[in-house]
Amino acid sequence: MTLNSLPVWPALQAHYEEIRDAHLRDWFAPANDRAPTRAERFTFEGGGLAADFSKNRLTDATLALLVRLAREAGVEARRDAMFAGETVNPTEGRAALHTALRANAPDAPFQAQVAAERAKMARFADAVRSGAWTGYTGKRIRHVVNIGIGGSDLGPKMVVHALHHVATPDIATHFVSNVDGADLARVLERIDPEATLAIIVSKTFTTLETMTNARSLRDWFVANGCPEGALAKHFVGVSANPAEVVKFGIAEANVFEMWDWVGGRYSLWSAVGLSIMIAIGPERFDELLAGARDMDEHFRTAPLERNLPVLQGLVGIWYRNFFGAQSYLVAPYSEALHYLPSYLQQLEMESNGKSARIDGAFVDYPTSAVTWGEPGTNGQHAFFQMLHQGPTLVPIDFIAVLTPEHPLASHHPKLLANCFAQSEALMLGRTLDEARKIAGPAKPELAPHLTFPGNRPTTTLLVDALTPRTLGALIALYEHKVLVQAAVWNINPFDQWGVELGKILGKVVEADLTAAQVDPAKHDSSTSALIARARKALGE
């Protein structure tokens, strides 16, 4: 199946040509925006969240055509296959059952395994939080260091930061991912070897960055007085390869299992989220799962016309494949969601940054947009200038939490006002005539610089309060959005072959950096020159 061969495609193309020059300002004009208002028609709810799509460049006819696209592309069949545990990751011959990790039904796949592992996690988390689990000298654990990269880092880090307000104040959680030693070194400056627990997270337990950091941390413990025989008090492992965990030196009792039917970027709901559970406790971790389950149920049962992940995915396709948008911005107006954009970068681009269709043919249409972002209001003072007045179209997801999770409540109206005002300004813009009035007769040359084209599309997601449950729903919303887009593009969102070639060549280059001699013909001239400069700096 090719996207542009679907029966609805010519109708979508014709519709795009029809409305491409229409301005949102006109659609919101009082004469045109009668009851039910545009905001009422294009605001939908699900899983405890609300999404206002009204400031997007679409009409009722657009949504109808996009929903038809979803049906013709088999979105419903792909969704149902994923939930049923079918092989939806054909290149690796695997299911993608992250939803089973939060299911609460006895007939859901792998429930006995999931329940047993979560119970083990809960016992361990309770022991650490209560002080029953101590370091080798009997000190309570005051620091947890999560060592992992990609999905073993981004998800847990994002959630622990987001739920800081409900986390225990007795334990600080640190995350180390980069093989750059500075990442680990800065954490080592802040922790006590007698009161630190390390969680090493790697699906294979062979990941270069993770194992390099894990070995350095183990050496640091020993160098700072921890007997090698007591390291079991300070190290646990999370992996789908328990034998490698034990081989590293972690006690078998300290191994938590993940499975090959859960992809790394979808794995925070599993034992990969052990650092989350220690931070917020097992009960709140269950609430996080419940929120994701709320969105799972909405995704499975809501009509496509009112289905938040479906609509969010289709709106993204509208801009990517018709308007030619190269990127889209995620702007959470919540400092607690500081790491959400970087988490979504991996979720979206590693999942859907593909050029090969499921059938092995190459696509002849764009797939994943570049995903980027920064919390508001910081972004307003960095890159919003380009969003308002630059020539590039960048669709935006605003995320607003309506009630604060902190005691400084007087700040919150200012935060929300900025979020809503930005969406209004991006939609309305400022005409040249309006700019001339502001510039005045004394400075007419200033008017062009005061114009804003407007018509910049935004979606605003509303969360009543940031809780484990609403956060779980928000994360699952984006997970399912990715699946919707993958189904339409006919690609596999659950593999990541694009990371492999660099890893293979990286091992060759690393060997050349320390080898006695290097064959300059082994690499291209640029790479050879880079290696030569590095060897000189390293004293080789």
From Swiss-Prot:
Give the annotated active site.
350, 381, 503
Q: Which GO terms describe its cellular component?
A: cytosol
Catalyses: alpha-D-glucose 6-phosphate = beta-D-fructose 6-phosphate
E.C. number: 5.3.1.9
Q: Which PROSITE patterns match?
A: P_GLUCOSE_ISOMERASE_1, P_GLUCOSE_ISOMERASE_2, P_GLUCOSE_ISOMERASE_3
List keywords of the entry alphabetically. Answer: Cytoplasm, Gluconeogenesis, Glycolysis, Isomerase
Do you know which Pfam families this protein is assigned to?
A: PGI
Gene name in the database record: pgi
According to its UniProt record, in which pathway does this protein act?
Carbohydrate biosynthesis; gluconeogenesis; Carbohydrate degradation; glycolysis; D-glyceraldehyde 3-phosphate and glycerone phosphate from D-glucose: step 2/4
Q: What is this protein called?
A: Glucose-6-phosphate isomerase
The root-end lineage is: Bacteria, Pseudomonadati, Pseudomonadota, Betaproteobacteria, Burkholderiales
The protein's matches in HAMAP family, at most eight in alphabetical order, are given as:
G6P_isomerase
Q: Which GO terms describe its molecular function?
A: carbohydrate derivative binding; glucose-6-phosphate isomerase activity; monosaccharide binding
**Member of which family?**
Belongs to the GPI family.
The UniProt entry, under InterPro entries, shows: G6P_Isomerase, G6P_Isomerase_C, Phosphoglucose_isomerase_CS, SIS_dom_sf, SIS_PGI_1, SIS_PGI_2
The answer to whether keyword Manganese applies is: no
Protein task: Catalyzes the reversible isomerization of glucose-6-phosphate to fructose-6-phosphate.
Q: Where in the cell is it found?
A: Cytoplasm
Keyword Heme appears in the UniProt entry? no
**Which GO terms are recorded in the biological process aspect for this UniProt protein?**
gluconeogenesis; glucose 6-phosphate metabolic process; glycolytic process
